[in-house]
Amino acid sequence: MRSTLAVTTALTLLLGIGVAEAADPTMLAQTAGFLLGNAHRCGVPDERVERAGKVIHDMIVAAAYDPSEAAAAGSRFDEMFLASAFPNQDPDALIPSCLVVVAQFHRLERHHQQADMN
């Protein structure tokens, strides 16, 4: 039951990246940090994770009302990235399958390429 809940929650978070409101840089930062941190954990090359991170950072700055909101969202991104990239061994920790993570990361990259954001 615990693994089903974890997978369902992970899928909801990962798929939710396309639903993040443009006016909510913190939600964008949180969701992207979760995805990119897990992509790093799952062995996606650093260059690709960094490229996606730069695009996300630019989106956060564009969506923020002012520099302090952008800085707060940037901090949230960092927190989520680190927590996802280097999860502790807590049996209740949300650690999504690398198969799901890599598929969602590829989806994000395709979206960025189609939108000419890279």
Predicted regions and their residues:
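Compact alpha-helical subdomains of small soluble proteins
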Residues: 46, 50-118
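Short N-terminal segments immediately surrounding and downstream of signal-peptide cleavage
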Residues: 23-40
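Generic anion/oxyanion-binding catalytic loop in active/binding sites
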Residues: 11, 24, 87
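Positively charged n-region of N-terminal signal peptides that target proteins for export
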Residues: 1-4
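Sec/Tat signal peptide C-region and signal peptidase I cleavage site
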Residues: 17-22
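Bacterial N-terminal signal peptides
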Residues: 6-16
